[in-house]
Amino acid sequence: MSRYRGPRLKKIRRLGALPGLTRKTPKSGSNLKKKFHSGKKEQYRIRLQEKQKLRFHYGLTERQLLRYVHIAGKAKKSTGQVLLQLLEMRLDNIVFRLGMASTIPGARQLVNHRHILVNGRIVDIPSFRCKPRDIITTKDNQRSKRLVQNSIASSDPGKLPKHLTVDTLQYKGLVQKILDRKWVGLKINELLVVEY
């Protein structure tokens, strides 16, 4: 199954807020969730919705998500917590959380087009796993800096998670440590994803 490129507001109406997918919000009067889906929710549907939230927020394919679940299952810690840590430490997500891009697909495009450096080297793989003490910067040319400048100016510095620091003047970010569960930018029950 390929990456989702369809209407984003439909997914937000169905699944709730997904800040990584888009900044848009549906109109307050158009609550289709209540209109069509009233009544008792089945357990399967609840688990499926949680999995879809995770997929659409981080922009993953089904196969990529399965791979991350298998890696998290082999870890000694809680599988759900390790899964979220793996997803949050992806390069495209770190670029998004630093405010260098307005959405995760936008951050993925910056990485694919070779505008982002990790520890002074160009990395063009969005799924690159960042480690603590990695330094994320933009390329030292005018075009790369202009692309990131607009996003940094419009981002809210209060939403920056505690495991990241950003220097807006030099377009530089630092991964200080691995993320805690409470700083994940998505309201999700990760145990339901693992059960699915």
UniProtKB/Swiss-Prot annotation:
Domain S4 RNA-binding residue range list: 89-150
InterPro entries (alphabetical): Ribosomal_uS4 (IPR022801), Ribosomal_uS4_bac-type (IPR005709), Ribosomal_uS4_CS (IPR018079), Ribosomal_uS4_N (IPR001912), S4_RNA-bd (IPR002942), S4_RNA-bd_sf (IPR036986)
Record's keyword annotation contains Chaperone: no
Key words, A-Z: Chloroplast, Plastid, Ribonucleoprotein, Ribosomal protein, RNA-binding, rRNA-binding
Annotated spans, Disordered: 17-36
SUPFAM superfamilies: Alpha-L RNA-binding motif (SSF55174)
CDD domains: S4
Gene Ontology BP, a term: translation
Main location, first listed in the record: plastid
Keyword Transmembrane: no
GO molecular function terms noted in the UniProt entry: rRNA binding; structural constituent of ribosome
Subcellular location: Plastid, Chloroplast
GO cellular component: chloroplast; small ribosomal subunit
Quaternary structure (record): Part of the 30S ribosomal subunit. Contacts protein S5. The interaction surface between S4 and S5 is involved in control of translational fidelity.
Function of the protein: One of the primary rRNA binding proteins, it binds directly to 16S rRNA where it nucleates assembly of the body of the 30S subunit. With S5 and S12 plays an important role in translational accuracy.
Family per record: Belongs to the universal ribosomal protein uS4 family.
Protein name per the record: Small ribosomal subunit protein uS4c
Lineage of the organism: Eukaryota, Viridiplantae, Streptophyta, Embryophyta, Tracheophyta
